Amino acid sequence: MSLARMLLKASLFAAIALLPIASVANAQSATEIQLSYKDKKFDPAEVTAPADTPIVIKLRNLDAKAMEFESKTLKVEKVVAGSSDATINVRAQKPGRYEFFDEYNEKVARVALVVK
């Protein structure tokens, strides 16, 4: 086996071996936001996150009924069963204000994500 071929194999092996480490580093750099939902209200009603950073929303539905967490601008939609928790992953965003709502109670159940 030639030296060039051995170096190529070693480089590929090293790159593949480092993939899990890169994934963990990316997961750790996400901003985590805690939200709760009860009586058609989100708490808190407004949250902030840094720009250009992935966001992980940890949502706890304290109501007995299901709700649908949705944002049309961010193309995020998730049904959350009553009395349960959900994790919603949001891609990194540019600065701005993004609205989320419960589709079943859209007019009153709203939360704002402010990205700075």
Task: Give, region by region, the residue ranges found by the protein language model.
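Short beta-strand/loop motifs in extracellular/secreted proteins, especially
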Residues: 55, 65-67, 109-111
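Extracellular/periplasmic metallocenter environments
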Residues: 29-34, 80-116
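N-terminal edge beta-strand
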Residues: 29-52
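Asparagine-centered strand-capping/turn motif at beta-strand->loop junctions
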Residues: 59-61
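Bacterial N-terminal signal peptides that target proteins for export
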Residues: 2-13
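C-terminal segment of classical bacterial N-terminal signal peptides
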Residues: 16-25
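Beta-strand-rich interaction surfaces with strong enrichment in secreted/lumenal proteins
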Residues: 45-47, 75-79, 89
